[in-house]
Swiss-Prot record:
Zn(2+) binds at H143, H147, E226. This is Protease HtpX homolog. Pfam families: Peptidase_M48. GO terms for cellular component: plasma membrane. PANTHER family: PROTEASE HTPX. Its cofactor is Zn(2+). The active site is at E144. Belongs to the peptidase M48B family. Its main location: membrane. The chain crosses the membrane at residues 14-34, 39-59, 158-178, 197-217.
Length: 298
Protein backbone atom coordinates (compact mmCIF):
# COMPACT_ATOMS: atom_id res chain seq x y z
CA UNK A 1 0.00 0.00 0.00
CA UNK A 2 2.88 2.38 0.85
CA UNK A 3 4.63 1.94 -2.51
CA UNK A 4 1.29 2.15 -4.33
CA UNK A 5 0.64 5.57 -2.73
CA UNK A 6 4.13 6.77 -3.67
CA UNK A 7 3.68 5.60 -7.27
CA UNK A 8 0.21 7.18 -7.59
CA UNK A 9 1.41 10.55 -6.26
CA UNK A 10 4.32 10.61 -8.71
CA UNK A 11 2.00 9.76 -11.62
CA UNK A 12 -0.46 12.50 -10.66
CA UNK A 13 2.34 15.06 -10.53
CA UNK A 14 3.52 14.09 -14.03
CA UNK A 15 -0.03 14.46 -15.35
CA UNK A 16 -0.41 17.89 -13.71
CA UNK A 17 2.92 19.11 -15.14
CA UNK A 18 1.91 17.95 -18.63
CA UNK A 19 -1.40 19.83 -18.27
CA UNK A 20 0.57 22.87 -17.06
CA UNK A 21 2.79 22.96 -20.15
CA UNK A 22 -0.30 22.45 -22.34
CA UNK A 23 -1.96 25.43 -20.63
CA UNK A 24 1.14 27.57 -21.18
CA UNK A 25 1.17 26.56 -24.85
CA UNK A 26 -2.55 27.38 -25.14
CA UNK A 27 -2.21 30.82 -23.60
CA UNK A 28 0.79 31.55 -25.84
CA UNK A 29 -1.08 30.44 -28.95
CA UNK A 30 -4.11 32.52 -27.93
CA UNK A 31 -2.01 35.65 -27.36
CA UNK A 32 -0.20 35.04 -30.65
CA UNK A 33 -3.48 34.72 -32.53
CA UNK A 34 -5.02 37.84 -31.00
CA UNK A 35 -1.98 40.11 -31.16
CA UNK A 36 0.28 38.80 -33.93
CA UNK A 37 -2.09 36.75 -36.10
CA UNK A 38 0.41 33.94 -35.59
CA UNK A 39 -0.34 30.95 -33.33
CA UNK A 40 3.13 29.42 -33.61
CA UNK A 41 5.08 32.53 -32.67
CA UNK A 42 2.94 33.10 -29.58
CA UNK A 43 3.29 29.46 -28.54
CA UNK A 44 7.08 29.47 -28.90
CA UNK A 45 7.44 32.79 -27.05
CA UNK A 46 5.29 31.52 -24.17
CA UNK A 47 7.34 28.32 -23.79
CA UNK A 48 10.62 30.26 -23.95
CA UNK A 49 9.41 32.69 -21.26
CA UNK A 50 8.28 29.77 -19.08
CA UNK A 51 11.59 27.91 -19.40
CA UNK A 52 13.72 31.02 -18.71
CA UNK A 53 11.62 32.00 -15.69
CA UNK A 54 11.67 28.45 -14.27
CA UNK A 55 15.44 28.13 -14.75
CA UNK A 56 16.14 31.44 -13.01
CA UNK A 57 13.95 30.47 -10.03
CA UNK A 58 15.40 26.95 -9.72
CA UNK A 59 18.89 28.30 -9.17
CA UNK A 60 17.81 30.83 -6.56
CA UNK A 61 20.28 30.79 -3.68
CA UNK A 62 19.47 28.46 -0.77
CA UNK A 63 20.94 31.06 1.59
CA UNK A 64 18.57 33.70 0.18
CA UNK A 65 15.51 31.50 0.85
CA UNK A 66 16.72 30.84 4.40
CA UNK A 67 17.36 34.54 4.98
CA UNK A 68 13.85 35.41 3.76
CA UNK A 69 12.47 33.03 6.41
CA UNK A 70 14.66 34.31 9.27
CA UNK A 71 16.53 31.01 9.47
CA UNK A 72 19.96 30.77 11.11
CA UNK A 73 22.46 28.07 10.17
CA UNK A 74 23.60 25.91 13.11
CA UNK A 75 26.42 23.47 13.71
CA UNK A 76 26.39 20.03 15.30
CA UNK A 77 27.66 21.57 18.53
CA UNK A 78 24.81 24.12 18.69
CA UNK A 79 21.95 21.68 18.01
CA UNK A 80 23.26 18.11 18.34
CA UNK A 81 19.89 16.33 18.56
CA UNK A 82 18.41 18.06 15.53
CA UNK A 83 21.66 17.78 13.58
CA UNK A 84 21.96 14.02 14.19
CA UNK A 85 18.37 13.33 13.12
CA UNK A 86 18.97 15.20 9.86
CA UNK A 87 22.22 13.29 9.42
CA UNK A 88 20.54 9.91 10.07
CA UNK A 89 17.64 10.58 7.70
CA UNK A 90 19.98 11.81 4.96
CA UNK A 91 22.05 8.65 5.35
CA UNK A 92 18.98 6.40 5.06
CA UNK A 93 17.79 8.37 2.00
CA UNK A 94 21.29 8.11 0.51
CA UNK A 95 21.68 11.83 -0.15
CA UNK A 96 24.44 14.26 0.92
CA UNK A 97 24.09 15.84 4.35
CA UNK A 98 22.02 19.06 3.93
CA UNK A 99 22.84 22.29 5.74
CA UNK A 100 20.90 22.68 8.98
CA UNK A 101 19.00 25.83 10.01
CA UNK A 102 16.84 26.90 12.95
CA UNK A 103 14.04 29.49 12.90
CA UNK A 104 13.38 31.29 16.19
CA UNK A 105 9.61 30.88 16.28
CA UNK A 106 7.24 29.20 18.79
CA UNK A 107 5.07 27.66 16.06
CA UNK A 108 5.59 24.05 14.96
CA UNK A 109 6.99 23.94 11.44
CA UNK A 110 9.86 22.91 9.18
CA UNK A 111 10.82 23.10 5.52
CA UNK A 112 13.52 22.09 3.06
CA UNK A 113 14.91 23.96 0.08
CA UNK A 114 17.53 23.55 -2.63
CA UNK A 115 17.39 22.71 -6.33
CA UNK A 116 19.16 19.37 -5.81
CA UNK A 117 20.38 17.10 -2.98
CA UNK A 118 23.87 18.57 -3.45
CA UNK A 119 22.86 22.10 -2.35
CA UNK A 120 19.91 21.42 -0.05
CA UNK A 121 19.09 22.69 3.43
CA UNK A 122 16.60 21.80 6.16
CA UNK A 123 15.12 24.25 8.66
CA UNK A 124 12.94 23.73 11.74
CA UNK A 125 11.38 26.14 14.20
CA UNK A 126 12.46 26.25 17.83
CA UNK A 127 8.85 25.44 18.73
CA UNK A 128 8.99 22.19 16.75
CA UNK A 129 12.29 21.13 18.33
CA UNK A 130 10.99 21.86 21.84
CA UNK A 131 7.58 20.17 21.55
CA UNK A 132 8.23 17.02 19.51
CA UNK A 133 9.97 13.89 20.75
CA UNK A 134 12.58 12.03 18.71
CA UNK A 135 10.07 9.70 17.04
CA UNK A 136 7.96 12.63 15.85
CA UNK A 137 11.00 14.67 14.79
CA UNK A 138 12.21 11.75 12.70
CA UNK A 139 8.83 11.75 10.93
CA UNK A 140 9.02 15.50 10.22
CA UNK A 141 12.67 15.46 9.13
CA UNK A 142 12.02 12.31 7.08
CA UNK A 143 9.28 14.29 5.32
CA UNK A 144 11.70 17.15 4.54
CA UNK A 145 14.50 14.82 3.46
CA UNK A 146 11.98 13.13 1.15
CA UNK A 147 11.25 16.49 -0.47
CA UNK A 148 14.97 16.79 -1.20
CA UNK A 149 15.38 13.21 -2.44
CA UNK A 150 12.28 13.43 -4.66
CA UNK A 151 13.37 16.81 -6.15
CA UNK A 152 10.09 18.30 -4.88
CA UNK A 153 11.59 21.77 -4.46
CA UNK A 154 12.59 21.80 -8.12
CA UNK A 155 9.16 20.52 -9.23
CA UNK A 156 7.31 23.04 -7.05
CA UNK A 157 9.55 25.85 -8.30
CA UNK A 158 8.81 24.91 -11.91
CA UNK A 159 5.09 24.95 -11.10
CA UNK A 160 5.31 28.40 -9.49
CA UNK A 161 7.35 29.71 -12.43
CA UNK A 162 4.89 28.35 -15.00
CA UNK A 163 1.95 29.83 -13.11
CA UNK A 164 3.74 33.19 -13.01
CA UNK A 165 4.56 32.98 -16.73
CA UNK A 166 0.92 32.25 -17.60
CA UNK A 167 -0.21 35.22 -15.49
CA UNK A 168 2.37 37.57 -17.05
CA UNK A 169 1.51 36.53 -20.62
CA UNK A 170 -2.23 36.85 -19.93
CA UNK A 171 -1.73 40.27 -18.38
CA UNK A 172 0.42 41.55 -21.26
CA UNK A 173 -2.00 40.13 -23.83
CA UNK A 174 -4.99 41.67 -22.08
CA UNK A 175 -3.36 45.10 -21.79
CA UNK A 176 -2.29 45.13 -25.43
CA UNK A 177 -5.80 44.21 -26.54
CA UNK A 178 -7.29 46.87 -24.25
CA UNK A 179 -5.05 49.56 -25.73
CA UNK A 180 -5.82 48.59 -29.30
CA UNK A 181 -3.33 45.83 -30.05
CA UNK A 182 -5.99 43.66 -31.61
CA UNK A 183 -7.72 46.34 -33.68
CA UNK A 184 -5.87 45.49 -36.90
CA UNK A 185 -7.20 41.96 -36.84
CA UNK A 186 -10.72 43.19 -36.28
CA UNK A 187 -10.52 45.62 -39.22
CA UNK A 188 -8.79 43.23 -41.62
CA UNK A 189 -11.05 40.33 -40.83
CA UNK A 190 -14.33 42.18 -40.75
CA UNK A 191 -16.30 39.31 -42.30
CA UNK A 192 -18.95 37.06 -40.82
CA UNK A 193 -16.75 34.02 -40.65
CA UNK A 194 -18.29 32.07 -37.75
CA UNK A 195 -15.14 30.03 -37.18
CA UNK A 196 -13.02 33.15 -36.77
CA UNK A 197 -15.50 34.66 -34.33
CA UNK A 198 -15.54 31.47 -32.26
CA UNK A 199 -11.73 31.29 -32.30
CA UNK A 200 -11.50 34.92 -31.23
CA UNK A 201 -13.91 34.38 -28.33
CA UNK A 202 -12.13 31.21 -27.18
CA UNK A 203 -8.77 32.99 -27.31
CA UNK A 204 -10.12 35.87 -25.23
CA UNK A 205 -11.66 33.42 -22.76
CA UNK A 206 -8.36 31.56 -22.38
CA UNK A 207 -6.56 34.84 -21.60
CA UNK A 208 -9.09 35.56 -18.87
CA UNK A 209 -9.27 32.10 -17.27
CA UNK A 210 -5.70 30.85 -17.69
CA UNK A 211 -4.23 32.57 -14.58
CA UNK A 212 -6.89 31.01 -12.34
CA UNK A 213 -6.45 27.55 -13.88
CA UNK A 214 -2.65 27.86 -13.63
CA UNK A 215 -2.90 28.76 -9.95
CA UNK A 216 -5.18 25.77 -9.27
CA UNK A 217 -2.77 23.39 -11.04
CA UNK A 218 0.23 24.79 -9.15
CA UNK A 219 -1.56 24.34 -5.81
CA UNK A 220 -2.64 20.81 -6.77
CA UNK A 221 0.99 19.89 -7.51
CA UNK A 222 2.03 21.29 -4.12
CA UNK A 223 -0.61 19.18 -2.33
CA UNK A 224 0.38 16.01 -4.21
CA UNK A 225 4.04 16.47 -3.23
CA UNK A 226 3.00 16.82 0.43
CA UNK A 227 1.17 13.49 0.28
CA UNK A 228 4.20 11.95 -1.42
CA UNK A 229 6.61 13.31 1.22
CA UNK A 230 4.42 11.93 4.03
CA UNK A 231 4.47 8.46 2.47
CA UNK A 232 8.19 8.70 1.67
CA UNK A 233 8.93 9.67 5.29
CA UNK A 234 7.28 6.45 6.45
CA UNK A 235 9.38 4.59 3.88
CA UNK A 236 12.55 6.07 5.46
CA UNK A 237 11.61 5.71 9.14
CA UNK A 238 9.54 2.50 8.89
CA UNK A 239 7.36 4.11 11.54
CA UNK A 240 3.99 5.49 10.37
CA UNK A 241 2.98 6.28 13.97
CA UNK A 242 5.81 8.78 14.30
CA UNK A 243 4.56 10.72 11.27
CA UNK A 244 0.93 10.45 12.39
CA UNK A 245 1.71 11.77 15.88
CA UNK A 246 3.77 14.60 14.39
CA UNK A 247 0.89 15.64 12.12
CA UNK A 248 -1.53 15.56 15.07
CA UNK A 249 0.71 18.04 16.91
CA UNK A 250 1.16 20.17 13.78
CA UNK A 251 -2.63 20.39 13.56
CA UNK A 252 -2.67 22.33 16.85
CA UNK A 253 0.12 24.74 15.91
CA UNK A 254 -0.36 28.50 15.75
CA UNK A 255 0.65 30.54 12.66
CA UNK A 256 4.25 31.71 12.45
CA UNK A 257 5.10 35.10 13.93
CA UNK A 258 6.96 36.53 10.92
CA UNK A 259 5.30 37.14 7.52
CA UNK A 260 5.68 34.30 4.99
CA UNK A 261 5.33 34.90 1.24
CA UNK A 262 3.36 32.56 -1.04
CA UNK A 263 6.40 30.82 -2.52
CA UNK A 264 7.90 30.08 0.91
CA UNK A 265 4.55 29.00 2.39
CA UNK A 266 4.38 26.09 -0.05
CA UNK A 267 7.74 24.78 1.24
CA UNK A 268 6.64 24.27 4.85
CA UNK A 269 5.33 20.94 6.18
CA UNK A 270 2.33 22.79 7.64
CA UNK A 271 0.56 25.95 6.43
CA UNK A 272 2.61 28.66 8.23
CA UNK A 273 0.00 31.38 7.95
CA UNK A 274 -3.45 31.78 9.41
CA UNK A 275 -5.76 29.01 8.23
CA UNK A 276 -8.14 30.13 5.53
CA UNK A 277 -11.78 29.15 5.37
CA UNK A 278 -12.19 28.78 1.60
CA UNK A 279 -11.98 25.60 -0.45
CA UNK A 280 -8.96 23.31 -0.15
CA UNK A 281 -8.57 23.78 -3.93
CA UNK A 282 -6.91 27.11 -3.11
CA UNK A 283 -4.59 25.73 -0.42
CA UNK A 284 -0.89 24.90 -0.78
CA UNK A 285 -1.33 22.02 1.68
CA UNK A 286 -3.89 19.21 1.88
CA UNK A 287 -5.95 19.10 5.10
CA UNK A 288 -3.94 17.47 7.89
CA UNK A 289 -6.93 15.22 8.64
CA UNK A 290 -6.66 13.74 5.13
CA UNK A 291 -2.90 13.31 5.45
CA UNK A 292 -3.35 11.42 8.72
CA UNK A 293 -6.11 9.26 7.22
CA UNK A 294 -3.91 8.29 4.28
CA UNK A 295 -1.11 7.25 6.61
CA UNK A 296 -3.50 5.20 8.74
CA UNK A 297 -4.71 3.38 5.62
CA UNK A 298 -1.23 2.23 4.60
Amino acid sequence: MLYQQISQNKQRTVVLLVVFFALLALIGASAGYLLLDNYAMGLVLALVIGVIYATSMIFQSTSLVMSMNNAREVTEKEAPGFFHIVEDMAMVAQIPMPRVFIIEDPSLNAFATGSSPQNAAVAATTGLLEVMNREELEGVIGHEISHIRNYDIRISTIAVALASAVTVISSIGGRMLWYGGGSRRQRDDGDDDVLRIITLLLSLLSLLLAPLVASLIQLAISRQREYLADASSVELTRNPQGMIKALEKLQLSQPMKHPVDDASAALYINEPRKKRSFSSLFSTHPPIEERIERLKNM
